[in-house]
Curated annotation (Swiss-Prot):
EC numbers, comma separated: 2.1.1.177
Record gene name: rlmH
Keywords of the record: Cytoplasm, Methyltransferase, rRNA processing, S-adenosyl-L-methionine, Transferase
Binding-site list for S-adenosyl-L-methionine: L73, G104, I123, S124, S125, M126, T127, L128
Highest taxon, organism lineage: Bacteria
Function: Specifically methylates the pseudouridine at position 1915 (m3Psi1915) in 23S rRNA.
CDD domains given in the database record: RlmH-like
Leader peptide range in chain numbering: none
Family: Belongs to the RNA methyltransferase RlmH family.
UniProt protein name: Ribosomal RNA large subunit methyltransferase H
Organism: Burkholderia cenocepacia (strain ATCC BAA-245 / DSM 16553 / LMG 16656 / NCTC 13227 / J2315 / CF5610)
Enzyme class: transferase
Length: 156
């Protein structure tokens, strides 16, 4: 099984890439994280947020691995603790399907994409920069894996 992070956005600051890479390189070979950046749509010429999100949805769908479990990150999603993520991870691994976490653009994710998600997940109640969400998600995935392995990284 592979973990994919599909993120609308590109040209992130160096510290975002460094933070993200720090956690992805810690993951074991059987649970690699792959980042797929989706070029954001321009919201110019009076273009509505809805049309931007719909265009980004098409790009996201084109980048989704076939048959992957879809976890859409959204401010209205369910709150999971780190332990809940750690409990979900082994089941996902046994299932064998890849898991794709999707981070939307500035306007969020298209409602159609959210409706078909297997899980609608909120990463925080606070509004965060999308680049920071990449780092937080990679860290939480590493932490969840470390919990399943009784690794000393997680000490709560």
């Amino acid at each position: 099984m592979k973990l994919f992070i599909l993120a609308v956005g590109h040209k992130m600051p160096g510290w975002i890439a460094s933070g993200f890479d720090e956690y992805t390189k810690r993951m074991p070979p059987e649970l690699r994280i792959e980042l797929r950046e989706i070029k954001p749509e321009l919201r110019s010429g009076g273009r509505s947020a809805e049309s931007v999100m719909a265009a980004e949805r098409q790009k996201i769908e084109a980048a989704l691995p076939k048959g992957a479990r879809l976890v859409a990150l959204d401010e209205r999603g369910r709150d999971w603790t780190t332990m809940q993520l750690a409990q979900a991870l082994p089941g996902w691994q046994q299932d064998g399907r890849d898991v794709a976490f999707v981070i939307g653009g500035a306007d969020g994710l298209d409602p159609e994409l959210k409706a078909r998600a297997d899980v609608l997940l909120r990463i925080s109640s606070m509004t965060l920069p999308h680049g920071m969400v990449r780092v937080l998600l990679a860290e939480q995935l590493y932490r969840a894996w470390s919990i399943t392995q009784n690794h000393p990284y997680h000490r709560a």
